[in-house]
Amino acid sequence: MKQENEMSVTVGSKAAGIGSAGRRGKAIRSDLWVQLEARSRGGIELDLSSRVEAYYGDAIRTQVEEVLAALGVTDARVRLEDAGALPFVIQARLEAAVLAAGVAPEADARPARTAALPPPPPRARMRRSRLYLPGNEPKFFISAGLYEPDGIILDLEDSVHPDAKPAARLVVRNALRCVDFGSAERMVRINHLPLGLEDLVAVVPEGPDMILIPKVETADQVREVDAAIDRILENSAAADRPLWLMPILESALGIESAFEIACASPRIAAITIGLEDYSADLGVPKTEEGAESAWARQRLVNAAKAADVQAIDSVYGQVDDLEGLKRWGERSRGMGYEGMGCVHPRQIRVIHEAFRPPAAQIEKALKIVAAYEQARAEGRGVVSLGSKMIDPPVVKQAQTLVEQARALGLAGADADEDTRPLDGDTGSEANR
């Protein structure tokens, strides 16, 4: 998603007892800029400028007073420039400004949860598309689910200015409590370690579905994140909720360690590659054809399959080139990838089409599964389709394809109801 150029740097701009947070400027919307000066007396003095003053001015003032009281701030001069921020954003910006002013909050002032936690996604759920949303730009959050990506990524890493990361962390935390992202899997890309450990403390208790770990080069880095999650969840309401991991491999060393990384934690559901950083690490430009990264991309697929996790491709950065995106997506699927990232909503439909199984493949898979079911019903160990014997790996691949087709509405749910994976002793004699 494109970021606005007009912004004020947030947490980090603080003088003695003065802190600011948020973003302001003519191009800014759905956000709030706050400057807070802590005082020893005098109560709360508010100076509010809001584009929605006529409708929500009083409500904003009331919320500001309530949040400050909850944080234990009783004496402060507060200046606010509001561009239509929602309550969860107002709370996050106020808390960030209080922290930037050097005031330690006296209590938990998180907003009440207004978005119900969706059912936890299965480890192997469909992940064709994942839409990146800059974590410090809440204007993108509200409508993101309407575009129906398989996943949304609240990004705390590359899309967020270093000085704004503490403030963005609070916005993302609150979004997980207050924004309905529809059917999308709710992912958070943390910062690379060690800063990412601070991100985990903020977001893990809110029940995200997946954590993306950037710039992973060793299995130990994954294990460090895994152990941190265990500690955070120990006394959390989200302790019984599965939390999946997706390491991002962005260097030559990361690719060389792909299999070890993919096996580093039972929480890992997928691994992916970051092509911009990978190409930079090689010292070569990233090209549309991708010849410079073809080996690494195939190496990652092989490692993922060997570890029984999903292989997810990188983003296609040319937002306006939808034909190029389609070609890239089709090649990606042909390499064994199960999805890819996207940086703009217009890419989602093209990606879904690129990763849609062709009708001929679905038809063949249905026939293979039907032949397997018939062989099992007749007590035969050999699966055949016509005069051709079908090996167990082929049946398993067909079952996976049928399940995917059903999820997409491309195959009837009543066709070949029992598609349980093959046991090791069932199947063709051809390879024995």
Where are these regions (language model features)?
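Expand to "…catalyze enediolate/carbanion chemistry for C-C bond making/breaking, isomerization
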Residues: 92-96, 100-432
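N-terminal intrinsically disordered, cationic/polar leader segments
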Residues: 1-122, 431-432
